[in-house]
Amino acid sequence: MYFKPNFEQFLPKKEDYEKAKKALDYIIPILEKTPHIYDVFVGGSYAKGTWLGRDIDIFVRFPKKYKGQNISIYIEQTLKEHNVPYIKLHGSRDYFQTFYEGLKIEIVPILKLDSPLEREFVTDISQFHVEWVKKNIKGLENDAKYFKIFNKLINTYGAESYLGGLSGYACEILTIHYKGFTNLLKGILKWKPKVFIDIEKHYSNIKEAINELGKDKTASPLILIDPVDKTRNVAASLSYKNFALIIANSYLYLNNNILYKINKSDFETMLEITFRVEETKEDIKNAKISRLTRKIVNYLEKNGIEVYAYTIDFDKNKSYLWVCCEKITIKTKHLGPPAWVNLDKFLEKHNKFFIREDGRLYTIINKTFSVYDIKKVYPEIESIKFLNNNPT
């Protein structure tokens, strides 16, 4: 689906900043009462000046002598004492979500460090990300916002494995590297796997980086070395599909001021699959739906039903597939026994047969396969139905 983007409508308004300030004025004094802390540190895109108005990250920093200890319990204790409603989420350390007039605030415990090398968990280096971006992005804040919006609009935003896109931090690094939104899109048109960007020159070349990081961390089409941590590829989760989608949309926007994204409204025959997923943690649930969808697509195509395109609605636990047909009948080999085992029974059923090199008999039969057969294979499927033109 082609569309003309309006980036301005996604930028935060004056009232968004006013609400954010009120939220911080409310929650920070409470968090500052947490026992044993070093300080409370506003981080994320809000601190960097690249905020899009959706949520705010607050880091509660503890002295590094607390490395190895459960520092999350001190934050939870403070939230309880001050009657702050919260949701506890599990990660390398437990962290917390609360809401202020609909604005989501994430409260993350980290260690106050002098160097990223001292980290206990990846979240500990977030403070260095903030410092690096603030130092280098001056004058390019809106450009970074535009590139984030660009990726959100074409569904290539988000570094979670099930999304396979670019993180906000990756968008900021790329904006800084190319010195602006338009220059970045022009630079993207020259991309071919593997793109190697090492803005702080931690490595002399891509070969050295791959040898140091290993194949798993450098399997993505874009190797974007973290400016503050040479052991990380910030674009490690970027899929080749989304890499290509970013390149294609850079061309479309620069030449025609339009964007394109895969949309179920383009599907002539749309098969809706609803999943029964009991997992409550969003990341795990969505990753499971993504894996199941890919397995189903492969299973359908293996059985002769071509899938032209598909998309996933994680909020509704649904996948939408554009398939060639509802069912298909194909000729397939039906394997029988060796000629010296139960030959009579096989010939009673099949008067035409062939013999393999190993002596086993086989015949050719017509096999009918329906899209509805996948429900027998994947018990996680709750329902299957066609939403528009039911194919024949």
Swiss-Prot record:
Cofactors demanded by this protein: Mg(2+)
GO MF term list: ATP binding; CCA tRNA nucleotidyltransferase activity; magnesium ion binding; tRNA binding
UniProt key word Magnesium: yes
Residues noted as binding Mg(2+) in the record, renumbered to the chain: 55, 57, 106
Pfam families registered for this protein in UniProt: CAA_C, NTP_transf_2, tRNA_NucTransf2
Alphabetized UniProt keyword annotations: ATP-binding, Magnesium, Metal-binding, Nucleotide-binding, Nucleotidyltransferase, RNA repair, RNA-binding, Transferase, tRNA processing
Biological process per Gene Ontology, one example term: RNA repair
Protein family (similarity comment): Belongs to the tRNA nucleotidyltransferase/poly(A) polymerase family. Archaeal CCA-adding enzyme subfamily.
Task of the protein: Catalyzes the addition and repair of the essential 3'-terminal CCA sequence in tRNAs without using a nucleic acid template. Adds these three nucleotides in the order of C, C, and A to the tRNA nucleotide-73, using CTP and ATP as substrates and producing inorganic pyrophosphate. tRNA 3'-terminal CCA addition is required both for tRNA processing and repair. Also involved in tRNA surveillance by mediating tandem CCA addition to generate a CCACCA at the 3' terminus of unstable tRNAs. While stable tRNAs receive only 3'-terminal CCA, unstable tRNAs are marked with CCACCA and rapidly degraded.
Additional free-text comment from the UniProt record: A single active site specifically recognizes both ATP and CTP and is responsible for their addition.
Protein name: CCA-adding enzyme
Source organism of this protein record: Nanoarchaeum equitans (strain Kin4-M)
Gene: cca
